[in-house]
């Protein structure tokens, strides 16, 4: 049994910018939590960043010292959060995420290939796209 929290994140938008949604899959031992949320009109990068932020915000205080790995298929997000890139856009959102990261003792980010055979990444993508589709159909 894995003793770390894995967070798979994805953002989707119809048009860029356009109606956008996020998908998050959190895994810890035998627990699973999924987040699917419409976030209004946004760019794909804002959706990807928002998914990461929501995933980190979903971690309970009692688990802040548990090792956490955030998986993203966004090179943009991975670069901003691991290579200390200076954001030219979305500055406030990036700052909020960087501030959130200071609350965790062991936090890492891993870049994964989008639309690969990783079932949790596929699920995060589905949650993000369904958030856009369901909101647009209301």
What are these regions (language model features)?
Residues 5-16, 53-123, 127, 132-138:
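RNase H catalytic domain
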Residues 1-46, 50, 57-59, 136:
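RNase H-like nuclease fold core
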